[in-house]
Amino acid sequence: MADFLKGLPVYNESNFSRFHADSVCKASNRRPSVYLPTREYPSDQIIVTEKTNILLRYLHQQWDKKNAAKKRDQDQLEIGETSAPPRKIARTDSQEMSEDT
């Protein structure tokens, strides 16, 4: 088993030559950072978390934003702007493509 562990960095004493136990103690003497609120909130305020998953909520919001334009276009068509030509035009080369395959 010694041959298996031979040459690993753990056996190299110079890896720990810059480590000083005193420096660890000095770092722990620093004061921890503390949050100081900038506004006063009522003490009887109750914070309630939402039941839905954050990812699901985000995806629903993105879907709503994406489909808002489609919904708006559909509403305009229902109002009476049906005389406007459609934005999409049928492909004329679709028959040629099916014949090639």
Swiss-Prot record:
Keywords: Ubl conjugation pathway. The keyword Transcription does not apply. Residues 67-101 are annotated as: Disordered. The keyword Transcription does not apply. Pathway: Protein modification; protein ubiquitination. One of its GO terms (cellular component) is Cul4-RING E3 ubiquitin ligase complex. Pfam families: DDA1. One of its GO terms (biological process) is regulation of proteasomal ubiquitin-dependent protein catabolic process. Functions as a component of numerous distinct DCX (DDB1-CUL4-X-box) E3 ubiquitin-protein ligase complexes which mediate the ubiquitination and subsequent proteasomal degradation of target proteins. In the DCX complexes, acts as a scaffolding subunit required to stabilize the complex. Component of numerous DCX (DDB1-CUL4-X-box) E3 ubiquitin-protein ligase complexes which consist of a core of DDB1, cullin-4 (CUL4A or CUL4B), DDA1 and RBX1. Belongs to the DDA1 family. This is DET1- and DDB1-associated protein 1.
